From Swiss-Prot:
Key word Lipoprotein present: no
Propeptide: 20-41
Upper taxonomic lineage: Eukaryota, Metazoa, Ecdysozoa, Arthropoda, Myriapoda
Annotated compartments: Secreted
Record-given protein name: Kappa-scoloptoxin(07)-Ssm2e
GO MF annotation list: potassium channel regulator activity; toxin activity
Purpose of the protein: Inhibits voltage-gated potassium channels.
Length: 74
């Protein structure tokens, strides 16, 4: 009887712990948005940036950064 409970515990515990860590990766869109937000914040801290919005895909003349949204470099 003890062996049965031990096997049951091990199987349930391993499925919940390993399943939660292996089957649930970080969603890529959320990770991509976080990286883009970090890039926007870096542009805002740059001394080339001004508080204006630029069209998507416009390159900054002085710095090789593609403006997507938020502060734009001029």
């Amino acid at each position: 009887m003890l062996v049965f409970y031990a096997l049951l515990f091990v199987s349930v515990f391993s499925n919940t712990v390993m399943g939660a860590t292996i089957d649930m990766p970080i969603p890529k869109p959320i990770l991509r948005e976080a990286i883009e937000e970090i890039d926007v914040n870096k542009r805002a801290d740059s001394h080339y940036c001004k508080e204006e919005n630029c069209p998507p895909g416009k390159h900054c003349p002085k710095v090789p950064i593609v403006c997507r949204r938020g502060p734009c470099c001029f």
